[in-house]
Amino acid sequence: MLAAADRVKALREAFPSEGLFAEKEWLISPQPFAIEEKRRADLERLGHQLFVFQRACNQLYQQSAKGKQPAWVARYLDLGKPAELIEFSRGKEFREDLPRVIRPDLVLTDDGWTIAEIDSVPGGIGLTAWLNQAYAALGAEVIGGAHGMLDGFAKILPRGGDIVISEESATYRPEMEWLVRQLQNRFPDREWRVAAAENYQPQNGRDVYRFFELFDLPNLPGIDALLAAAGRGELAITPPIKPYLEEKMWFALFWLQPLREFWRRELGDKYFRRLQGMIPYTWILDPTPLPQHAVIPRLEIHDWREAAKFSQKERDVLLKVSGFSPFGWGSRGVSLGADLPQAEWEKQIDDALAKFESEPTIMQQFHKGKLFDQPYWDAKRDELKTMRGRVRLSPYYFVEENRAELRGALATICPADKKLLHGMRDAILAPSAFAERAES
């Protein structure tokens, strides 16, 4: 086996000359992130559990819109969205359509993991595919193998197709262009392209992988033709044009007592209890007054404005813009209450309540990640070091015939002092592998 320095050198030499992310850097580890072998079955099953959850979300919204479930469910999920987009998303042509790529962001904990969120339009597909290829070439048995990500993506666009990406998402364009080159080499009988969303011209029978956010539609002047073609059944779009499925508030709806029996029935008791152990308790910051005798569950407050007075210890929660906003994706609209000065915390609560009708916000229990050790190469000192950090694990599941198959898992290892886990210059990005691992 190659020494660590030689492995890092080989990984650097394998890096695409065109890059993978625009103006983004990360630390390189000589080995994959090791996930305990005893977690294998749980991680492989998680994809189907989340597929069933998203299917239930789709059903709940549609039944709510038709009056067969409480009307307030659809009202919550439609907040801030234009009427024409709501109408389009309810079209009978797309009734059963669900995302074909499921990527949860998991924070690894002492007990396994908690699901921070499910990414609606996940980036990192090309990056994870490259990492899997590069580390597999060095002999690592990465999750999904060398070509799992490519094969999974090809399954969701079986006729080939276009990855349609917006300027707003341009950071990810290099990885998508790399992905298309690899797909073209591996599946030469199909045509693959990356195309700009701003002036995209749809073609009959040419399916689309959507890599643009739905809040960005007003900035995409040519997108009406794509939506019209999808409405006529001339092509398929994934993820589907369903803004209600892209709201983080689904985790709050999952915990609401009036919907408990719906979730138990649609998920099945086993999946329901399993998801209860992984989905953090979440609230919607709704300023609607409560009856005098009522309190907000678990917080024991009568009015959200009381939350503005929480102590620093009580503020160990996350505030997140729920969706359909430039602040609704990535880490842009996320803050940890315990890290905010009291005045800033109060302002964020007040702003969230004031913007409820146009840009709803959720509050979510914060789970601090477990510490792991991962080697990385310090380029400045030209030596191997060990980072003790917290891990965001992002498994990629590709939906194939109503089954979600695990095809790769990107590990983002952040320094121990970082509480919000996301890609950053001083984080390690590595593929994952199942292995026996000593406790850290």
Language-model regions, residue ranges each:
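Preference for protein termini
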Residues: 1-440
